[in-house]
Amino acid sequence: MVSRRISEIPISKTMELDAKAKALIKKGEDVINLTAGEPDFPTPEPVVEEAVRFLQKGEVKYTDPRGIYELREGIAKRIGERYKKDISPDQVVVTNGAKQALFNAFMALLDPGDEVIVFSPVWVSYIPQIILAGGTVNVVETFMSKNFQPSLEEVEGLLVGKTKAVLINSPNNPTGVVYRREFLEGLVRLAKKRNFYIISDEVYDSLVYTDEFTSILDVSEGFDRIVYINGFSKSHSMTGWRVGYLISSEKVATAVSKIQSHTTSCINTVAQYAALKALEVDNSYMVQTFKERKNFVVERLKKMGVKFVEPEGAFYLFFKVRGDDVKFCERLLEEKKVALVPGSAFLKPGFVRLSFATSIERLTEALDRIEDFLNSR
């Protein structure tokens, strides 16, 4: 028998639906899969070429569990310059995607029963990871009427002696909203006053369509109470390469490195050198293309009378539906061959998530089918 804690953890709903859509496509069905949490662009050619070059050298060996020094140094330099922070490579740990960076952070910080505050709608893997690490979860709901912006007052009201961290995700998955500077400033002050960590997942920070984006690093003085999470999957279309990273105090980074040394040993060596090259690659063409797609989907859904908050980042649009969102997605896939993710997967029933990480041509066809489906209900 498998352990109780694993039995109680659901499979990732987004991964499950993505696999279901791909299975139908493999059978020859004309399914438009808008569940994907990954860019549809190929990995930039210079990155692929660097991986090939490194493979041909034949030096594919274990690396430091924290990641190769050159990559940690490059990340520290880039993030340090962007946010005017003095960051040492020893504060950086390279991980198997940002997802492992998050899991390692929870494992490093949480004792049994420690609480993490999260905001709903919430990405599908946060809560299972916290539970697997022995923590408990307190969910703060956000609302479309308030543009899915979190409330500092609600956070303060929920703080208890076992609160170890507050987890934020901006730009947000699934809503696409960007958290306001005033909230982040207040959260930093509160963390210092009440002695908790802020874990900030900013994996979509390179895909922003507003001038108002604020990172937690813009408003924090240092890394004593901060764990910053990012990666290369979304910024450089490297989802399958599995390279993410964590930046925090040296104390937290050392703890995370210890975990990694006993789990994965290190990150794929070839992927690390590919990521090092990616630091030199401009991704502005991706941002512009996603912005055009976002604008297209927004205008089309407005004409359809659909209610939503316009995304400011990432590549998702989270819109309201009538009735059961799970049945909505099941019927849409069955009748119109369009795959979306129900809001219930993000603890927000009554909504669905659409990914616009595909071509305008396919988005046009998908929205035509969705409109037909809505009109037939």
From Swiss-Prot:
It is found in: Cytoplasm. Gene3D superfamilies: Aspartate Aminotransferase, domain 1 (3.90.1150.10), Type I PLP-dependent aspartate aminotransferase-like (Major domain) (3.40.640.10). L-aspartate binds at residues 37, 123, 173, 353. InterPro entries: Aminotransferase_I/II_large, AspAT/PAT-like, NHTrfase_class1_PyrdxlP-BS, PyrdxlP-dep_Trfase, PyrdxlP-dep_Trfase_major, PyrdxlP-dep_Trfase_small. Its EC number is 2.6.1.1. It catalyses: L-aspartate + 2-oxoglutarate = oxaloacetate + L-glutamate. This is Aspartate aminotransferase.
